[in-house]
Amino acid sequence: MEYRSLTLDDFLSRFQLLRPQINRETLNHRQAAVLIPIVRRPQPGLLLTQRSIHLRKHAGQVAFPGGAVDDTDASVIAAALREAEEEVAIPPSTVEVIGVLPPVDSVTGYQVTPVVGIIPPDLPYRASEDEVSAVFEMPLAQALHLGRYHPLDIYRRGDSHRVWLSWYEQYFVWGMTAGIIRELALQIGVKP
């Protein structure tokens, strides 16, 4: 796939043709979800946030909108939509959910389900001052180019964990967020 010319139609066709395998073993039992917001344009964008530097966990990191599943959430999809509305003011009714990726174990003990959704291009994003310091859009074709991600092996508590890292403009994209973007690229058939 030529990543420089990815259209929204190409992305949707590839995503729907290659359904993800969800039967992954996970070590964590606490549930969380993130929304992967794809901005509806002929050349689609990927909406990302930078977390507030005042947060206890993952301060200042680039992330998708998301968080823990609450008792009031009907599903992981509902949790992702609720969190996206709380963090960046994306109304749930404007999100066209097209599917989910396999859950990912976070270092903080959550099983995180990435929910892929298409959002309108003209939404007035409003970052939650408590949680988000910036909202930015990255061209989806650039985000899904696997050559931009570099492996880094981190040793923690006697175990080795591979994380991926990249950057876009002044933003450093790494860890679970970079891993989810890579998983999305592999899901639509991008070759390493």
From Swiss-Prot:
Mg(2+) binds at residues 83, 87. Belongs to the Nudix hydrolase family. PCD1 subfamily. Its cofactor is Mn(2+); Mg(2+). This is Uncharacterized Nudix hydrolase NudL. Pfam families: NUDIX. Probably mediates the hydrolysis of some nucleoside diphosphate derivatives. A motif (Nudix box) lies at residues 67-89. GO terms for biological process: nucleoside diphosphate metabolic process. Its EC number is 3.6.1.-. It comes from Escherichia coli (strain SMS-3-5 / SECEC). InterPro entries: CoAse, NUDIX_hydrolase-like_dom_sf, NUDIX_hydrolase_dom, NUDIX_hydrolase_NudL_CS, Nudix_NudL. One of its GO terms (molecular function) is manganese ion binding. Keywords: Hydrolase, Magnesium, Manganese, Metal-binding. The gene is nudL.
